[in-house]
């Protein structure tokens, strides 16, 4: 019987692989350079994210599970930046720093939601033989319940056979999301997780379920695997093991917005489940549910234990949704006890538009949980005039509750949410527009409690007033 729980009390996971730092520069583009026929981007914001094996570790940490990350980096600023980023998510890093190579970094320049350019700073590690990395792996294995080898083809796993042997000697399951068509190099692993196209590139075209099973079992025998999980997009996933019936799970995705990083989520939850003592079937079930959540988000994302628990039990993936102040304080206390970072913002959100959506997505990325405090109808009327709000409080909150970026919604009836913020005390208070941080309601209370305050830019040209004006023009 499956343990329908997203709590992994015994799990500890070790990750080794190609670690990367993803950097994003965002800016406005209004003219062409006089020097060359290229756009000029005025950089206004930037963001850093963990990539490659580091993203796998981030996925595991999001499940409130202890995780250690091993890999190769340069002795450079980007390597330090990556370690700092991971430390914020309570990920223990033990990197081998090389003076001969830079930390793999990908810099993307974006404007108006379009990627204009990507710059790669890397020299792969294919010719690097790192005994130090093997020694770190050997000494760490005994303290963990599963090993993930994250292969992005950059060379960190060029001694993958020795790594697999070390794990087998320690009786630790080894899970690998394979790269390329040479699956022989993964001989002896516990589990591979190829997607359908990767699987068919190795075994040939499969025209039926029976052929998938037949060729999958043959591959397991050929390279001495314990199991094979083929992820099949909208067709779900299929687990194959010797002398066991095929175990198929239909997709859990309701809507698919972006499959970026879904493979990392699958192998992260699989490894966590196995490290927690779950069966292959249980771990695959949880991984399938997690994949259904993450493909409904934009960009590389992680899945929290609350989201996973909610999906298992048929609740909304937006967390606990609309709630009273008392309920909010209770769940915030629980989230803080789990070490989650709480972000809070507020507004009228009268007619939801792309500027709102973009702003809330950016706010959510700054922490683990996003609270949106919404002005009551009377509060909006006092601030905006007798003709507002256009939509009543219930309607405004119902629409906001449908956004994947929003975890918790609460109403407030005063002109500002200062009292509410002082009682909730988020880790980060966010406001959009041209405010000075010290002028934002609740900022002093948040600072006094050790939190921070941040101002985010709104998307140019997007406002409720502009929407209302356009509607009035059409009417006239």
Curated annotation (Swiss-Prot):
Its EC number is 2.7.1.167, 2.7.7.70. Pfam families: CTP_transf_like (PF01467), PfkB (PF00294). Transmembrane segments: none annotated. Residues 344-476 are annotated as: Cytidylyltransferase. Catalyzes the ADP transfer from ATP to D-glycero-beta-D-manno-heptose 1-phosphate, yielding ADP-D-glycero-beta-D-manno-heptose. Residues 1-318 are annotated as: Ribokinase. In the N-terminal section; belongs to the carbohydrate kinase PfkB family. In the C-terminal section; belongs to the cytidylyltransferase family. Homodimer. Keywords: ATP-binding, Carbohydrate metabolism, Kinase, Lipopolysaccharide biosynthesis, Multifunctional enzyme, Nucleotide-binding, Nucleotidyltransferase, Transferase. It comes from the Bacteria. PANTHER family: BIFUNCTIONAL PROTEIN HLDE. InterPro entries: Bifunc_HldE (IPR023030), Cyt_trans-like (IPR004821), PfkB_dom (IPR011611), RfaE_dom_I (IPR011913), RfaE_dom_II (IPR011914), Ribokinase-like (IPR029056), Rossmann-like_a/b/a_fold (IPR014729). ATP binds at residues 195-198. Pathway: Nucleotide-sugar biosynthesis; ADP-L-glycero-beta-D-manno-heptose biosynthesis; ADP-L-glycero-beta-D-manno-heptose from D-glycero-beta-D-manno-heptose 7-phosphate: step 1/4; Nucleotide-sugar biosynthesis; ADP-L-glycero-beta-D-manno-heptose biosynthesis; ADP-L-glycero-beta-D-manno-heptose from D-glycero-beta-D-manno-heptose 7-phosphate: step 3/4; Bacterial outer membrane biogenesis; LPS core biosynthesis. One of its GO terms (molecular function) is ATP binding. This is Bifunctional protein HldE. The lineage of its organism: Bacteria, Pseudomonadati, Pseudomonadota, Gammaproteobacteria, Pasteurellales. It comes from Pasteurella multocida (strain Pm70). GO terms for biological process: ADP-L-glycero-beta-D-manno-heptose biosynthetic process; lipopolysaccharide core region biosynthetic process. It catalyses: D-glycero-beta-D-manno-heptose 7-phosphate + ATP = D-glycero-beta-D-manno-heptose 1,7-bisphosphate + ADP + H(+); D-glycero-beta-D-manno-heptose 1-phosphate + ATP + H(+) = ADP-D-glycero-beta-D-manno-heptose + diphosphate. HAMAP family: HldE (MF_01603). One of its GO terms (cellular component) is cytosol. The keyword Cell wall biogenesis/degradation does not apply. The active site is at residue 264.
